[in-house]
Amino acid sequence: MAITKSKQQKTRKKVKRVVSDGIVHIHASFNNTIVTFTDRQGNALCWATSGGSGFRGSRKSTPYAAQVATERAAAVAKEYGMKSVAVFVHGPGPGRESTIRELITQDFKIVEITDVTGIPHNGCKPPIKRRV
């Protein structure tokens, strides 16, 4: 009898809140691009990656893969009612510019664009450039 009661637990429907303005964090590395939509306090609403969008291997690090990832995350962010965003770009990857272009085509009002890429004060030795 106790087993059937535990299986019939009440599940509450998740209420989506309305967020009119937020922040887009773009982490563009050489291998992948991660796009995260947050509210003003930094609570994540939705995210997408180029690897999770169906791209694998070297195609994952292309600007088109970053564009598709932004398109997927923007569709979910519009369900929250987001209209204006501040963009924080982190990293030197190829998906930096195409992600911002896709945000413009998705009709988001971009309030500010900030580059928050870390600059080493003579920290780790950078990887050696490939000679192909």
From Swiss-Prot:
<comment type="function">
    <text>Located on the platform of the 30S subunit, it bridges several disparate RNA helices of the 16S rRNA. Forms part of the Shine-Dalgarno cleft in the 70S ribosome.</text>
</comment>
<keyword id="KW-0689">Ribosomal protein</keyword>
<dbReference type="GO" id="GO:0019843">
    <property type="term" value="F:rRNA binding"/>
</dbReference>
<dbReference type="InterPro" id="IPR001971">
    <property type="entry name" value="Ribosomal_uS11"/>
</dbReference>
<dbReference type="GO" id="GO:0003735">
    <property type="term" value="F:structural constituent of ribosome"/>
</dbReference>
<dbReference type="GO" id="GO:0005840">
    <property type="term" value="C:ribosome"/>
</dbReference>
<dbReference type="Pfam" id="PF00411">
    <property type="entry name" value="Ribosomal_S11"/>
</dbReference>
<keyword id="KW-0699">rRNA-binding</keyword>
<keyword id="KW-0694">RNA-binding</keyword>
<comment type="subunit">
    <text>Part of the 30S ribosomal subunit. Interacts with proteins S7 and S18. Binds to IF-3.</text>
</comment>
<protein>
    <recommendedName>
        <fullName>Small ribosomal subunit protein uS11</fullName>
    </recommendedName>
</protein>
<dbReference type="InterPro" id="IPR036967">
    <property type="entry name" value="Ribosomal_uS11_sf"/>
</dbReference>
<dbReference type="GO" id="GO:1990904">
    <property type="term" value="C:ribonucleoprotein complex"/>
</dbReference>
<comment type="similarity">
    <text>Belongs to the universal ribosomal protein uS11 family.</text>
</comment>
<keyword id="KW-0687">Ribonucleoprotein</keyword>
<dbReference type="GO" id="GO:0006412">
    <property type="term" value="P:translation"/>
</dbReference>
<dbReference type="InterPro" id="IPR019981">
    <property type="entry name" value="Ribosomal_uS11_bac-type"/>
</dbReference>
